[in-house]
Structures are given as C-alpha cells and as structure tokens.
Regions:
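Anion-binding and metal-coordination hotspots
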Residues: 1-319
Length: 319
C-alpha cells in the first residue's frame, strides 16, 4: 500500500466524469486488489480476504504474458450458484426463475392444506441461496420430522419434482411428494420425431435393451453419476455399428453417421417410480387433489406484498 490508496479509496463513491475513467479505475482497482492478495499468506486469509479473492477470480485473470486484465465472456465466468455478487453479502447469489432475475436468496414456504381445516398453518419457512428447488426438499422434510409435522402427502410445484428427491422422501420419511414431473428433455421427444428412450424396451433382469427394430444392446454400463444434483444416475446401454449402420430407420434413431446408438436411463427403482407417478398424474383424482396446492401462492403473495418479503433481511437456515 502507498499514500495514493487513501485518495483512491478514502471516499465510498467516486462517480467518473468520462466513460474512459471507468475503465481506468477498474484496471487500477484490479491491480491494487491483486497486490493486496499477493501480500497475504494464502493459508491465513480471513473471510473478507477470501471474498476478495473470489471476486478477483470472477473479474480478472493473469494472461500468458503475466499481465493482469479484465475477464471477458470468452474467458468464461463462474456459474451463478458460486458467483459472489456483492462484497457486502458474499452468500447472496443471482437467481433466475422463468423471466424473473434477482440477486439474493430464495424463500421456501410449507403450509397445511387439509380440506376440512378452516385455516392453513405454516409449518416450515426457510431462506436458502438460489439452489434448485428440489435440493431444498430434504431439509424441509428433516425439519418437519424434527417437529413431528411430516405430512403423508406433500404437494409441490414442478421445480421440486426431482425423481431422486421423490424417492428419497418416500424412503427416508414415508412422504409421497406430488407435483408435475418434468418432461422428456430430448429433441426427439419435443419434436415428436424418431425414436426416443421410451421407444426402447428395457430388461433390467437380463441387463439388455431392445430397440424398436428388434436389435438387442451389446453392452450395459453404469451407474454413472450426473453433474446435476437433482438428476438421477444413469445406466447406459450401447449398440454396435454393425447393428445400427445397416438399419433402415437409422436416421430416425441417431444423427451420427459413424457411431451407434446409446440409450441412457435411470435405475429400476427410479424408472418404476417415474412410470407410476406419471400414470397417477393423468387421473382425475390426482388432478383434483393437486389443485389445493395453489392456495400456498396466496400465502406467498401476502408475504411479498404485505410484509416486504422480497426486500427484508431474513435469517438463513442451512438445510
């Protein structure tokens, strides 16, 4: 540090008079922060110094010439789940839900919805970082179990319906989680063209898959973990080039000219659960029960517009 630091950072805000001043000050701030971090032992950095290090990694890099410069989109940026958005609140993250974006946290509200009850009672409310909604389910059920308030059926919106967490809720807490399951994300399924995974017959006992043309897979591999915390691990069945290349329906099955078709699918217990849930969700009884879930939207609306939930600071609880 030198005497010029007091001039540069003694005031909380210094508005630039010219656009070029912003770039100049950004470079100077990056150089100063880099110098400061270089002078601190890496094993003795306090939380604020660690937050500064993260912010520097997000916004600057040292190139091949050893020169510190601003990071661009081409250089890559950390994902929103780990990116620090404010030095004043290093736990806050950017959240995206549909067309809505904000910086901060998520609030998860659970309430009773008994048909014969005169009022609905809030049984759990928690503030988390903007994780996927399904990741909040285990913590919600753990807290409800601790209070003796676990329901037999938990109605949720589509953001909470991960097959992994639905199975876990049944296994660990005997809670049936009901909500719209996400559809098949593959291009073939969306465009209703070609053969997608559901067109293949899976025989778990024989560890083989049969394609719509009657060819049987040559190998069975997995389980393979996925990068998403809400996605199920996958088994992958593979066909050979000798099976796929002569097939008259090849263009409907794979877009690759060289390789053969692979089929990925979840383990038996998750696939059976998925099939059962999707069948149940087509019944009038399930649809009638699920309409009750919309009542919690009124509670969230009251929190938002009546109590300033989107602007007040809430205590955060770990799931």
């Amino acid at each position: 540090m030198d005497a010029d630091w007091a001039t540069r950072y003694g005031r909380p805000v210094r508005l630039p008079s010219r656009p070029s001043h912003t770039v100049t000050r950004l470079k100077q701030a990056g150089a100063d922060a880099h110098q400061l971090l270089q002078s601190l032992p890496s094993h003795r950095r306090a939380p604020r110094a660690e937050a500064l290090r993260q912010i520097m990694v997000q916004n600057f890099l040292v190139d091949a010439r050893g020169v510190l410069r601003s990071r661009t989109e081409k250089d890559g940026r950390p994902k929103g789940a780990v990116r620090v958005i404010s030095p004043y609140d290093p736990d806050a993250r950017q959240a995206i839900r549909g067309n809505t974006r904000w910086n901060g946290y998520l609030v998860h509200v659970t309430e009773t919805c008994d048909a014969d009850a005169r009022v609905n009672l809030i049984t759990d409310i928690v503030t988390t970082s903007p994780i996927r909604d399904a990741q909040a389910l285990p913590g919600i059920h753990t807290r409800l179990a601790r209070r003796g308030l676990l329901p037999t059926e938990h109605l949720v919106d589509g953001g909470y319906t991960s097959m992994v967490h639905l199975e876990r809720a049944e296994r660990e807490h005997q809670v049936t989680v009901n909500g719209p399951l996400p559809g098949n994300p593959t291009r073939r399924h969306r465009q209703h063209e070609g053969f997608d995974r559901d067109d293949f017959h899976i025989d778990f006992d024989r560890r083989q898959v049969t394609c719509p043309r009657g060819q049987v897979s040559s190998s069975w591999h997995g389980l393979y973990p996925t990068s998403s915390p809400t996605a199920a691990p996958l088994i992958v069945a593979k066909f050979t080039k000798g099976q796929c290349q002569p097939c008259p329906d090849r263009s409907r099955c794979t877009t690759s000219r060289e390789s053969a078709r692979n089929v990925g699918f979840p383990p038996r217990e998750l696939r059976d659960l998925q099939a059962r849930v999707r069948t149940e969700q087509q019944t009038p009884d399930w649809k009638a029960r699920y309409t009750v879930r919309s009542e919690v939207e009124g509670t969230i609306n009251e929190f938002t517009h009546g109590h300033g939930m989107r602007h007040c600071l809430l205590p955060r609880a770990s799931s």
